[in-house]
Design a protein with these regions (language model features):
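Basic, amphipathic alpha-helical bundle interface domains used for macromolecular binding and assembly
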Residues: 114-208
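Conserved phosphate-handling catalytic cores of large alpha/beta enzymes
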Residues: 111
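An amphipathic alpha-helix signature
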Residues: 100, 104-108, 148, 152
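Conserved ASCE/P-loop NTPase catalytic core
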Residues: 1-93, 99-100
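Conserved AAA+ ATPase "SRH/arginine-finger" region at the nucleotide-binding site
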Residues: 90-102, 120-122, 141-143
């Protein structure tokens, strides 16, 4: 953001001050409580890895990673996330209510005086380099032409007006009919990129 700074002789000028976006990992807690104007400001950051203030572009740190939480129940004081913003997230996970044993574990860990130490995966000095190396390694995983065809078919199958969807059924219903009934807008090219990169990362973790 820009703040007013008083210079010599009583002269005042706007001076750029980096905000919370200038970090490696950004956690947007309850992002749906942010106003549409605030949410739209994140579009450039998430896609271009930069922000533009007063006509000047400022690059963000690499790697730049955004995580967000959303309250799916409470509606008061919340705003609908723009489709363009949701499309920029890699995954959207729905967290179910804890099961019996999970809830007991939460009780044990949060209602006693014992403290827990988080063990870092790697030291802060080498973190950026290691993450960059891992991201590069994921992209080097080979994907066959058949797999690319399959991923492309999955993405196209999410479009109601698609004519090239996979000819399959689910519980007796044709996939095309299900999509036409429940989906308004299908996944875009970013969806295909996300599925491909997720498959590559999963294959790498599996030693393939």
């Amino acid at each position: 953001t820009q703040i007013v700074v008083e210079k010599g002789g009583g002269r005042k000028e706007f001076e750029f001050t980096p905000g919370p976006l200038f970090t490696n990992v950004l956690l947007a807690d309850e992002i749906n409580r942010a106003t549409p104007k605030t949410q739209s400001a994140m579009l450039e950051a998430m896609e271009e890895r930069q922000v533009t203030v007063a006509g000047k572009t400022h690059g963000l740190r690499e790697p730049f990673f955004v995580m967000a939480t959303q309250n799916p129940i409470e509606m008061e004081g919340t705003y609908t996330l723009p489709e363009a913003q949701m499309d920029r997230f890699f995954f959207r996970l729905h967290i179910a209510f804890p099961k019996f044993e999970e809830l007991k574990k939460i009780l044990r860990q949060t209602t006693i005086n014992e403290s827990y130490t988080i063990q870092p995966v790697f030291d802060s000095g080498s973190a950026v380099a290691k993450v960059a190396e891992m991201r590069k390694l994921v992209r080097e995983v080979l994907v066959s032409s058949d797999m690319e065809d399959y991923i492309t078919s999955i993405i196209l199958a999410t479009h109601p007006d698609n004519k090239d969807a996979l000819d399959s059924t689910s519980g007796g219903d044709n996939i095309t009919d299900l999509v036409g009934r429940y989906v308004t807008y299908g996944a875009g090219p970013r969806g295909a990129q996300a599925v491909t990169l997720a498959a590559k990362a999963n294959a790498l973790l599996d030693g393939r």
